[in-house]
């Protein structure tokens, strides 16, 4: 399945490949390969939702800071780029903020274009910041303010590689992932509530 916001790119790739085929086979092969790349990039696989607080994005954990409740995930080009709600709640803020396009792993990336999400949950306010990178140019939101979210529900599509910073309520959760760990959105448990909630 292709994610909403990526279908047009894949469709154009298919049409361009077909159009080029009668005239330039090498170009058609190149366009076909690029279309396959786009289909992989914008894939939206079904997920079994995991226990506890789950990862908001596919990728690699780049930073963990329990003192801030921070879990930061870097998305490479090969990763699924559909983000998901790590915890159920109500959306209090869902805003695209314009900014730069520095590499997503750079310190200056905090000033990049981003999608800021605040969710009111039973354990307190959870904040997610989805940032575009040097290649990622746009975030396609799937949610709006006032909306109730189920755990694992789709939040957005980030077009190409990027980063997601998740801020959990300090003292309310125990972070369970480490820097360098691979995670999958909606599936990998990244934190737990000490009293055993959010199963």
Question: What name fits each language-model region?
Answer:
Residues 1-199:
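Contiguous, well-folded functional domains in the mature portion of proteins
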